[in-house]
Structures are given as C-alpha cells and as structure tokens.
Amino acid sequence: AGDAVLVSLAKLLRYSLRDIDLPARLGGEEFAVLLPGEGAEGAIILAERLRSAVEQDAVAFGGKHLNYTSSFGVISLPAQGTAGKLDAQVAKNVALLKSRENTDVADILYSLVDAALYQAKETGRNRCMPVDLANLADQIST
C-alpha cells in the first residue's frame, strides 16, 4: 500500500506545484517542498491546499480504496533581496540557535520545521503547523 500512496502523492504534487517548486522525499514518509520566492502566507496556503487534496485522495490497493492524511510543518524566509529587512528579533533568535547548535542556517530551519511537523502530528494529525521565526522563545529556551 505504501508504494501506491507514494505514486499517488507524486502525481498530486506534480499537479499542485509550480514548475519552479522543488519537492523532495527526505526518507520514509517525509517530504519537503522548496517554494522559491514564496512568502510565509503563500507557503501556508499551499500546504493547506496539499493537505486537503491528500485527505480527499484514495488509493486503490488489494481491491479496496485506502484514504490517507498528511501533516505539514511550514517555514519561510524572506524573498531574496529582502533578507536585510529581517526583524531584529528574528535575526537574533536565528543567530542564537546557530551558536547553540553549531550548525548552519539551513540545518536550523530544517530542525525548526521538523519540530513543527511533529507538533502537527502530536496535536491531532492532518494539519499544517507554521514556524513563526519572530517568536522562537520556546525553541531557544529548551
């Protein structure tokens, strides 16, 4: 059944994303989609649209139709050329995380969005959970 779901999901992504968007399977049942030039609001709208489409999808397997759901963590950075306009608190929070985790910004963003994904799963599944870079106090204090 898992392979049938992956095939169906790949088709759904192909028809739902722009040509410049980049979906990637991270492993198992985890995927990432890079949305160049898309802001936080657009990313959340797309994640919700994908979540709804997955919820309505059914996969034929073993003579039955199987439904499945999805959960999303969503994170966004400013578009290229506007990074200098990052709110001072966001920049401070990201710098603090970088110094604590001794890693680069991409790894920090992945850690934050992965935590949001698991929060979405823990709070009922089949939902989208955005990361608010301006309010990282919870992630920094732990």
Map each language-model feature to its residues.
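Glycine-rich helix-loop "coupling/hinge" segments at transmembrane-helix boundaries
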Residues: 1, 62-64
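Conserved long alpha-helical elements within nucleotide-processing catalytic cores of c-di-GMP signaling
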Residues: 1-15, 24-28, 32-33, 40-48, ...
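Short helix/loop segment flanking the catalytic signature motif in cyclic-nucleotide metabolism enzymes
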Residues: 5, 32-52, 65, 70, ...
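Conserved amphipathic alpha-helical interaction elements at protein-protein interfaces in regulatory
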Residues: 15, 19, 37, 52, ...
